[in-house]
From Swiss-Prot:
Role this protein plays: Involved in the biosynthesis of lipid A, a phosphorylated glycolipid that anchors the lipopolysaccharide to the outer membrane of the cell.
Family membership: Belongs to the transferase hexapeptide repeat family. LpxA subfamily.
Keywords: Acyltransferase, Cytoplasm, Lipid A biosynthesis, Lipid biosynthesis, Lipid metabolism, Repeat, Transferase
GO biological process: lipid A biosynthetic process
Pathway: Glycolipid biosynthesis; lipid IV(A) biosynthesis; lipid IV(A) from (3R)-3-hydroxytetradecanoyl-[acyl-carrier-protein] and UDP-N-acetyl-alpha-D-glucosamine: step 1/6
Descriptive protein name: Acyl-[acyl-carrier-protein]--UDP-N-acetylglucosamine O-acyltransferase
Oligomer status and interactors: Homotrimer.
GO MF annotation terms: acyl-[acyl-carrier-protein]-UDP-N-acetylglucosamine O-acyltransferase activity
Compartments it resides in: Cytoplasm
Catalytic activity: a (3R)-hydroxyacyl-[ACP] + UDP-N-acetyl-alpha-D-glucosamine = a UDP-3-O-[(3R)-3-hydroxyacyl]-N-acetyl-alpha-D-glucosamine + holo-[ACP]
EC number, as in UniProt: 2.3.1.129
Length: 258
C-alpha cells in the first residue's frame, strides 16, 4: 500500500508503486515515476520527467529532477533516471540532462550520496558509489562502479572517474582519473592505487600486483602516455583489469590526470 502524508503534495499524474512512502511537505511533480518500496522523507522535491527505481531512500530537502543549470536549456523534456537501492541524503541536488548533451542524467544502483552532494546535467553514475558530503560533479561527468569521492571533491565537466578510483577530500579534478587510482589535492595529483578499496572488494594479491605494475608504468617510468599504453599491452595483456585501464586511456577525451 502506498502511504502519502496528508501534508504532501503529489500531482495526480505522478505514478507511485506499491509501498512507496511520501513524507510531509514533500512535492512530487506530474511526470514522475517512483517504483515500489521507495521512501521519501519530509520536504523533498521531485520534478520531472524523472524515473526512480525500487527501494531508494530519499531524505529531507533533497531536490531531484529540476531543470539543468545550463544557459542553453529551453525547457526540453529531458530526464533524470535513478536506479534501485540508492541512499540520497539531505540537500542533495540531481538535475535533468540537456538536449545538447545526452538528454538524461543517469544514476545506477546501490549508491550512497551524502548530504549536499550535487549531480549536474548529463552525468552518468555507475553502481555502488560513495560520495561524501558536498562532493560535486559538473555536467557530463562519468563515474565508474565502486568509485569513491571524498567530501568537497569537485569534478570538472566532461571528466571521467574510473571504476574503483578514490578521490580524496577536497580534490579538484580537471582530468580523467583512471580505474583503481587514488588522487588527492586542491589540484589533484595521483598517489598510487586504491589498495585498501581493492582488498575490501576481494581483489586477489595477483590482481593487485598487476594493477600496481600498470600504475608504475603509467606514472613512474617517465613514459609518454602512448608508450606507456603500448608497454601495458605487451607486458600485462593477461590482466583484464589492466585491459580495462588501457580501454579507459583509449577513450579519454580530456587526458589523464598525471
Amino acid at each position: 500500500m502506498t502511504r502519502i502524508h496528508p501534508n504532501a503534495l503529489v500531482d495526480p499524474k505522478a505514478r507511485l508503486g506499491e509501498e512507496v512512502e511520501v513524507g510531509p511537505f514533500s512535492v512530487i511533480g506530474p511526470d514522475v515515476e517512483i517504483d515500489e518500496g521507495t521512501w521519501i522523507g519530509p520536504h523533498a522535491v521531485i520534478q520531472g520527467p524523472t524515473r526512480i527505481g525500487r527501494d531508494n531512500r530519499i531524505y529531507q530537502f533533497a531536490a531531484l529532477g529540476e531543470a539543468p543549470q545550463h544557459k542553453g536549456y529551453q525547457g526540453e523534456p529531458t530526464e533524470l533516471v535513478i536506479g534501485d537501492g540508492n541512499t540520497i541524503r539531505e540537500f542533495v541536488t540531481c538535475h535533468r540532462g540537456t538536449a545538447q548533451g545526452r538528454g538524461e542524467t543517469r544514476i545506477g544502483d546501490h549508491n550512497w550520496l551524502m548530504a549536499y552532494c550535487h549531480i549536474a546535467h548529463d552525468c552518468r553514475l555507475g553502481n555502488h558509489l560513495l560520495f561524501a558530503n558536498s562532493a560535486s560533479l559538473a555536467g557530463h561527468v562519468d563515474v565508474g562502479d565502486h568509485a569513491t569521492l571524498g567530501g568537497f571533491a569537485l569534478v570538472h565537466q566532461f571528466c571521467r572517474i574510473g571504476p574503483y578510483a578514490f578521490c580524496g577530500f577536497g580534490s579538484g579534478i580537471n582530468r580523467d582519473v583512471p580505474p583503481f587510482v587514488t588522487v588527492s589535492g586542491q589540484m589533484a595529483v595521483p598517489h598510487g592505487i586504491n589498495s585498501v578499496g581493492l582488498r575490501r572488494h576481494g581483489f586477489s594479491r595477483e590482481r593487485i600486483r598487476d594493477i600496481k605494475r600498470a600504475y608504475r608504468t603509467i606514472y613512474r617510468q617517465g613514459l609518454r602516455l602512448d608508450d606507456a599504453r603500448e608497454a601495458l599491452c605487451q607486458q600485462l595483456s593477461h590482466s583484464a583489469d589492466v585491459q580495462g585501464m588501457v580501454d579507459f586511456i583509449d577513450n579519454s577525451q580530456r587526458g589523464l590526470l598525471r
